Amino acid sequence: MKTEKKNINIQIGKRLRTARQNSGYTQEAFAEALDVGVEHYRKLESGIYGLQPEKMLLLYEKYKIDPTYLITGDKNHAFDIELFAFGIGMKWV
């Protein structure tokens, strides 16, 4: 189970890096948007740390980075922010 979670974090981190680079932003900009230090952000991209759903919503809100893409790698769907927020117990306004 621990290995599976680590592999998921690595895959999400790779997609996070790709999305950031494709958007033309620096690690510093994404770290600031997530309210974490640059070193912490680097660990998110490398998969050492897992990206929390609440942080995914912040990236969506600021940069339109699709949380479903980060989780699954699927780019071909309609993302529903309200449903995602509801699923993690947050209210989206």
Question: What are the residue ranges of the model-derived segments?
Answer:
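DNA major-groove recognition helix of helix-turn-helix/homeodomain DNA-binding modules
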Residues: E54-Y69
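Helix-turn-helix DNA-binding elements, focusing on the entry/boundary residues of the two helices
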Residues: L16, Q27, P53-M56
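Flexible coil/turn residues that form the inter-helical turn or adjacent wing/linker of helix-turn-helix
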Residues: I12, S23, G37, Q52
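Short alpha-helical DNA-recognition segment
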Residues: G24-K43, L58, K62
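Short, charged recognition helix plus adjacent turn
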Residues: M1-K2, E61, I71-V93
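A short, Lys/Arg-rich alpha-helix, primarily the initiator
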Residues: M1-N22
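Residues in the recognition helix of alpha-helical DNA-binding motifs
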Residues: A19, A33, L44, G73
